[in-house]
C-alpha cells in the first residue's frame, strides 16, 4: 500500500514539475514543425518571442514617400479605424489559444502582444510576444504562441486611415490576460 501511495505521489509531483517547465530561460532558436521561432532574453530577463522570418519588427516605422521616421504624438495620430469586431476577434483568438489549466496558471498576469500591420491591406504581417522569463508565460509552450500568431494573421484585419496608409507598416500592441 505504501508503495502504491509513493508512486502516485511521485507521478503527481512529476506532472507538477512538467507543468512548470520554463521554456524561455536563455536566448535560443526553436525549430518546430514547419516554423522557426526566436526567443531573445534581455539582461532585464524580458523575453521577446517571434517568428524567425519576421523582418518589419526590426525596421523603423517610417513614411513610404520620404523615409522619414514616424513618431507617435502624445495626442495620438490615428492610424487604424476603430471597430468593435476586430478588437473582439483578436481578444478571442488569444483567449482560445490557452487551455483551461494554462489560463489558471497565468491568471492575474498580462501577455504583451505586438503586431505589424500591412498599411495597404490592413492584414497582420508579423506578431511578437513579450513577457518575463521568470513569470508564468515562460511556462507556456511555443505551440500556443504559434497558434495565436497564425490565427491573428488568418482571421484579423484592420482598415488603415489615410495617415496609416502613408507608413511602411503600422505598429500595434496590447496587453491581455487570457480569460
Residues covered by each model-derived region:
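Bacterial Sec-dependent N-terminal signal peptides
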Residues: 1-27
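Charge-biased low-complexity segments
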Residues: 20-179
